[in-house]
Amino acid sequence: MGQKVHPNGIRLGITKPWISTWYADKSDYANNLNSDWEVRQYLTEKLKAASVSKIVIERPAKSIRVTIHTARPGIVIGKKGEDVEVLRAYVSKITGTTAQINIAEIRKPELDAKLVADSIAQQLERRVMFRRAMKRAVQNAMRIGAQGIKVQVSGRLGGAEIARAEWYREGRVPLHTLRADIDYSTAESHTQYGVIGIKVWIFKGEVLDGLVPAIEEPKQQPKRKPRGK
């Protein structure tokens, strides 16, 4: 049975950047990795209502810089920057170094796979029909400018006794093309019937780095001479 490779993992270092960018000696590597995990767990839990897509961590010169990509920067910053200062102090406490927190606003949340998956999960928890939630997400993404989107939900859909998976796709979603800019994410929806898993693939176009795609002209077939001449 054919399985699909993780769309982000196969493109890592080609068209997808790492979400942690730092170098450490062998003695410090495990501590840095563990503190990265703790920072992400804390921020994800603390900023549940802030529509956080991803958290990028950098470690320049014995300090840590955390960039929070969110669709609702006002919730992260808080009144007069009080909330972000609390986050900065706690991140500094976890890592034991000076911390800096930057906030990047996501202008088009309909084209962010993580935010789309979280939105569908929240709708399912509010007992919205899963087909309606899927179709709404697909229509919004295509309307904003996606070249293709695929949404899959799996579990006890509609409270059915037997779990199953259903998916809906519109446009192109080329999984094997490495230059394709595909945003992929997952989410879980905890309903009264059990956990429903959500997967979202969004195709935003091809990453060509300024190259113009070559368009091959169809070759003209040589004319055949009629027989008998």
Curated annotation (Swiss-Prot):
GO molecular function: mRNA binding; rRNA binding; structural constituent of ribosome
Protein name as catalogued: Small ribosomal subunit protein uS3
Gene name for this UniProt entry: rpsC
The KH type-2 domain, residue ranges: 39-107
Pfam families, per the entry: KH_2, Ribosomal_S3_C
Similarity comment: Belongs to the universal ribosomal protein uS3 family.
UniProt entry tagged with the keyword RNA-binding: yes
Keyword tags: Ribonucleoprotein, Ribosomal protein, RNA-binding, rRNA-binding
GO biological process: translation
Protein function: Binds the lower part of the 30S subunit head. Binds mRNA in the 70S ribosome, positioning it for translation.
Domain of life: Bacteria
GO cellular component: cytosolic small ribosomal subunit
InterPro entries in the cross-refs: KH_dom, KH_dom-like_a/b, KH_dom_type_2, KH_sf_prok-type, Ribosomal_S3_C_sf, Ribosomal_uS3_bac-typ, Ribosomal_uS3_C, Ribosomal_uS3_CS
Complex and partners: Part of the 30S ribosomal subunit. Forms a tight complex with proteins S10 and S14.
SUPFAM superfamilies: Prokaryotic type KH domain (KH-domain type II), Ribosomal protein S3 C-terminal domain
